[in-house]
C-alpha cells in the first residue's frame, strides 16, 4: 500500500479561486450582492479566494492556449443555444469567459466571482462595452440570491488531477438552484484517468543525484530524498513515452446528474498490463473534459468502455463533434500538467506484466478543498 496526500503545502496550492454571486441587469439587486460579498467565510475558503486575487494565477490560465481556445471553441460550437439566453459563469475570474459568451450573443451573463478579482472583472466588462449584458457580482455562488433561472452554466472549475480545489460542488449548487430543465452546462462531462509511469530521468535527478555531488558522497540524503519525492504528489509534465499501460478511468463525471456527495470518497479498482520492460516509478493522473449537451441515457460513459476505444474515438473527432479539452501526456501540455504519485523506489516490470490494485481519492476532513490519495499496488 502506497499512501499519498494532496495538501496545501505542496505545489498544488497554485491553482485558482472561484464561486460567487450575481444579479441580472433586470433586477439591480445591490442589497443581495452586498449580502453575498459580506457573507462569512470559512478560513480555508478565505485563503483560497485570496490566492486568486493575484494576477499571476489568471495570467497562467489565460496564456494556456489549449485551455482558453477550448472554452472559446466550445462557446462558438454552442452559439445557437447561447444566443439570446441567460448565462451564469461560476467563478468568472477576469471575466474572459463571460465576455466570450456575451460576444456569442448571450442576452445576459451573470459573472460570479468570490475573489477580489471581481473588481477588475467589472472594469474589463466596461472597457469592452458589455456592461449592459454582463453583470459581475462579488460573492460566493452559494450566498447569492438570483430570481431568474439560467439557460447556460459555464465554469472553468477543474483543478490539478481534476478534483483538487473542490470547486465542482459550487457548479453543481448553481445547477440545482438556477439551471432551467434542458439547460446547457459547459463543460458537460469530465473523466479522471490514471496509469503507471516510468521516469528514470526525474528519479535520477531527484534521488540518485545525491550519491555523488561534485565528488562528495552525499548518499546520506538519499533516504530523505526518497521520502520527500514520494510523500506528496508532483505536478509536472510527462510525455506519452512515460506511460507504461493503457490508462484506466478513476472517475467519470456527468455534470448534468452528478451529486456533490459523491466527491467525498472515490474508490476504483484497476488491472492493467505493462506495455514494455521498464522500471515503474509511480502513477500519473490526468483528465479530459467534454463540452457536450445533456447526456443520452443510452450513451456509455468512459468507465464502461475500453480505454483504447476512448482514445481512438477522441482522435477521430470531426468538426461536428463536441469540443474536448485534454491534459493527457500525449497531448499538448497545459498549465495543469500531470499529477504524479512517485514510489520511494522504482520496481522493474516485464512486458505484459499485470499491475493491479485500487486507488482511493477522498476529501480531507480538515479542508475539503484538499485531497487524500491512497494507492494500493501489486505486481
From Swiss-Prot:
Broad enzyme group: transferase
Domain SAM-dependent MTase PRMT-type, residue spans: 45-379
Keywords for the protein's UniProt record, in alphabetical order: Methyltransferase, S-adenosyl-L-methionine, Transferase
Matches recorded under SUPFAM superfamilies: S-adenosyl-L-methionine-dependent methyltransferases
Bias type Low complexity, positions: 19-35
Disulfide bridges in this chain: none
Residues annotated as the enzyme's active site: 156, 165
Gene3D superfamilies with a match to the protein in the record: Hnrnp arginine n-methyltransferase1, Vaccinia Virus protein VP39
Xref: PROSITE patterns: SAM_MT_PRMT (PS51678)
GO molecular function, one term: histone methyltransferase activity
Annotated spans, Disordered: 1-35
Gene Ontology annotations of biological process type: methylation
Purpose: Arginine methyltransferase that can both catalyze the formation of omega-N monomethylarginine (MMA) and asymmetrical dimethylarginine (aDMA).
Annotated protein name in UniProt: Probable protein arginine N-methyltransferase 6.1
Organism this protein belongs to: Oryza sativa subsp. indica
Gene: PRMT6.1
